[in-house]
Amino acid sequence: MATLVDPPNGIRNEGKHYFSMWQTLFEIDTKYMPIKPIGRGAYGVVCSSVNSDTNEKVAIKKIHNVYENRIDALRTLRELKLLRHLRHENVIALKDVMMPIHKMSFKDVYLVYELMDTDLHQIIKSSQVLSNDHCQYFLFQLLRGLKYIHSANILHRDLKPGNLLVNANCDLKICDFGLARASNTKGQFMTEYVVTRWYRAPELLLCCDNYGTSIDVWSVGCIFAELLGRKPIFQGTECLNQLKLIVNILGSQREEDLEFIDNPKAKRYIRSLPYSPGMSLSRLYPGAHVLAIDLLQKMLVFDPSKRISVSEALQHPYMAPLYDPNANPPAQVPIDLDVDEDLREEMIREMMWNEMLHYHPQASTLNTEL
């Protein structure tokens, strides 16, 4: 539970109060009353809370010492920029970003999201029975949210069950946009250690420079398979092993299906793998609906140019009971998400402060040089 504590050094900043949760100090706006910690990651701690002004339950994510690691600072800045613009019922809403007291010295960032009950990873791990209707509804919402994100010219690039938040009535929302990029960005290959390998498309594993929205479709296919089988379909131990597992299940690829590989060494590796006839997905998932298997086969295609698109997936017969072509408006404007990878800390700090001001316009009149 949350414990009210004295401020560090006994100095209380105006408009803030202080709580300890899981040995972590939260310095938060007084309108938020924390309930309990609900999650922890490399970034810090998340707690549930009530906004006493609106009586709404929210999740507060504390990102500790955000400038200690420049990559993490850039991830946070991207998330702020993106979620300020995205408005869709299958994308998590960022409600507030708390304003620090001092612009030039703040280290921690507090993000306030709508509160969800759990995530798809926890549901898949649980003993909760997942019917065909469950799988269909989760997949439909994931595709709807992704179609909207792609319409804003954005690749998510880190879709996995843990980044899909779910509430008690099975509403699903995509979260964690720290790795998202504009889909026309070139030459920004993904940093190995931050990308989740099991959901990574072949073209990323093969270090192809020219990738697009189909990388997210591959991840959706992996998530769909995990919903059907209650375990990840490709549990590789490292990059080459991941490729080997993919070929084992999909089967050895024809020469024309390797044309997209622009890295000669990577192409040689794929050709060197022992022949595999592949495995039948209907045998892997004997309880799955025949149309579910058909859609999964169209998502888990090695060659990205032959993989089904999000729009096509929504129009697949498996989605027919849920899909309404008139209920999927695109994002209003393509979002300029480009954040220079080489920004110095002072510039990241300045841009982050400006993002915070969108939620607290009155703060722009205050002295920010401290």
UniProtKB/Swiss-Prot annotation:
The lineage of its organism: Eukaryota, Viridiplantae, Streptophyta, Embryophyta, Tracheophyta. The TXY motif contains the threonine and tyrosine residues whose phosphorylation activates the MAP kinases. Activated by threonine and tyrosine phosphorylation. It comes from Arabidopsis thaliana. PANTHER family: MITOGEN-ACTIVATED PROTEIN KINASE (PTHR24055). It catalyses: L-seryl-[protein] + ATP = O-phospho-L-seryl-[protein] + ADP + H(+); L-threonyl-[protein] + ATP = O-phospho-L-threonyl-[protein] + ADP + H(+). Dually phosphorylated on Thr-191 and Tyr-193, which activates the enzyme. Autophosphorylated on threonine and tyrosine residues. Phosphorylated on Ser residue. Interacts with MKK3. SMART domains: S_TKc. Keywords: ATP-binding, Kinase, Nucleotide-binding, Phosphoprotein, Serine/threonine-protein kinase, Transferase. Residues 32-319 form the Protein kinase domain. One of its GO terms (molecular function) is ATP binding. Highest levels in the stem. Present in the leaf, root and flower, but not in seeds. One of its GO terms (biological process) is auxin-activated signaling pathway. Pfam families: Pkinase. Its EC number is 2.7.11.24. The modification Phosphotyrosine is found at Y193. This is Mitogen-activated protein kinase 1.
